[in-house]
């Protein structure tokens, strides 16, 4: 078996080195995502012959699965090693979150071996032009501009935005707990997992090179967000929370953060909607420039 183990902070340089050979716009390729959600998905990692290999457990209780190898070297040999690892563990060999360009790479080294399927868009990432999120320009985003302008008018002199720092991280986490209580989800398993992930990210904020922001009204936090630059041209927003009872709060934290923290990228990846109808509607309403489509690869026969 391959020597899979829990991912640690010390893996960050090697993960980023392996990922640098592929400019894939999927959030699963981001070290921050792998690290902060490691307990939730039982994420395990190992390195072999210049490649990063990842094994995860799906939330539906199904068999463990693998991410497609990223790195530089003999991709075919590494795929064979993963298949052997699955066999030795008594697992069906399944590779998830396969980017479209990776399909071409796999086909080049193991032609006709795999079937690639895309059964649901629930896990596909929403990827936007950073400029559009900064300016909210154009007819399609007029409703977003209106909400931002109404917020600024209604709360003139009462609202403020600030970048996340060591001094205000605790305020962001306190708002997360408030948000969970406000939405009646504090005891749900998924949100317990999210709380653990947020703790991991905020506790290691500087080492993970995160950027974040807080929106305040009358001095109290009403929204926060954070993420990281995952590729030379893409920023990934890992978390965004706002008080839904305050109209325009979500739109404000979105725009204010991107205006201040995403000027060095072309794209902003706001991750998937998980099949949640409200989240899907919200993400589609910003009109993504593209979707990060994720395929599943299984051996034929």
Regions found by a protein language model. Give the residues of each.
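Conserved active-site alpha-helix within GNAT-family acetyltransferase domains
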Residues: 102-117, 146, 274-291
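Intrinsically disordered, low-complexity, positively charged segments
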Residues: 10-40
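Acyltransferase donor/substrate-recognition loop-hinge adjacent to the catalytic core
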Residues: 110-189
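Short catalytic-loop micro-motif centered on adjacent basic/acidic residues
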Residues: 94, 160-162, 267-270
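Short, conserved active-site entrance elements at the starts or edges of catalytic domains
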Residues: 167-220
